[in-house]
Amino acid sequence: MSKKTRVPEVADDCTKTVYPDPIPMPTCPQLINDGTSCFLNIILQMLKRANFHDHFKGDWQKGKQKMLMHKELQQIFNGKPGPKDVSRLREMFSNEALKDGPHPLLVALKCLIKMSAVSDNDVIKEKGARDKMFQKQSDESNKMFAEHFIKTLLACKGMTKIRTMDIFRLIHICKKIFTVQKSMVEIDGPVRICGDLHGQYPDLIRLFAQGGFPPDSNYLFLGDYVDRGSFNLEVILLCLAYKARYPNNFMMLRGNHEVIHINEKYGFKDEVFNRKGEYHDELYPEFNEMMDMMPLVALVGGRILCMHGGLSQHIKSLDDLRNLRRPFHSEDECLENDIMWSDPAKVSGWTANPRGASVQFGENEVKEMCKLLDIDLIVRGHQVVQDGYEFFAGKKLVTVFSAPHYMQSFTNSAAVCKVSAGLEVSFEVLKPEDIRVEEIKCSAESSCASDMQQ
């Protein structure tokens, strides 16, 4: 067998159908970032297997240009590969000088890309047909699907292996779960309460790594999974997958960015279009229809009230929160809108909110609401706070924010509010500079825990 025909079997079988088309180097963000080193190491093994150097000296000796490329490849593989190396490889393998023969490396590389690519040929664009197919799946089948989805997303460190049809199915599953659950979910401790994430997927993974991936820990998220960050799809999909797999241990509330007239302006719509453009017109509305059905409030142990935004003067009892409307138009002035938009502030009474939506409320309003509802603490998100958490109204309300170094322009830490089975409250703080974790427990004299024991 000559050197020219000495090719890996997997490549040899595909030569006629795959080569000599231009080599489409992957362009997904994950491959250009975290997956770069792994991918280039695979190519390096192919180089060795295909005896690349011999080909350059023998059958492929066609000038100084190829020899220079060979040296450049060696420099790439001998060093630490980076995003620029991927760009250079893409440029090399699309070079006209390398298209005139079935070189084993190029064929094997093309086959690798073809085998690793995600096929979206099975997408059913018509919503009714999709829903009809998904409705046939059992709850057990859906949980198995969600578990596989989680493993795929985590193993690939991103969406490189996620099919569009699987995203449609996950949305369908979670919409069904949210619809069945009440507008105010009532749960017990222990639970870890997380604030805004805003598309910061690496930080979400750090939160799980520190506190335990589900189901090792129970979680309650306060909303704002998307917008302003770089990995909105990864964040919302991982959270939805955990929700589908552990519907009673992983709770998700709706934030003001889970609203179509907000997330169409602040990044989520653009990301869906840029990364799933062919199916954007179907996928983006599906996301928002599902978000419309998310619960708005949670009550932990009957004593800790949680929501994304804050309070409303329309709240007269816990039954008002149990009966919140879903879906609703968030542009309206209503109780549901206040739950997602209102803010605590150093004001007296209920005043107009500078955001242009909902209201602000003062310390007295917080204390009176706690007495009215017979609760000990209000936990909410919605605002960046420097230390990741910040108390208000004599520790009757706390703001929790879980996106450190927010938008890469703030120096804030992130925090998680930990509630024990006995409703004792403590906080884990993730520092942005080195992702150090500190645990702050409320002291016996001035703690939330002491308030809850009254």
From Swiss-Prot:
Single GO term (MF): protein serine/threonine phosphatase activity
Entries under PROSITE patterns matching the protein: SER_THR_PHOSPHATASE
Catalytic machinery residues: 257
InterPro entries registered for this protein in UniProt: Calcineurin-like_PHP_ApaH, Metallo-depent_PP-like, PP1_catalytic_subunit, Ser/Thr-sp_prot-phosphatase
Record-linked SMART domains: PP2Ac
Binding residues annotated for Mn(2+) 1, in chain numbering: 196, 198, 224
Gene3D superfamilies reported in the protein's UniProt record: 3.60.21.10
Single Gene Ontology BP annotation: defense response to Gram-negative bacterium
Cofactor requirements of the protein: Mn(2+)
EC number: 3.1.3.16
Cofactor note: Binds 2 manganese ions per subunit.
Name of the protein described by the UniProt record: Serine/threonine-protein phosphatase C23G10.1
Species whose genome carries this gene: Caenorhabditis elegans
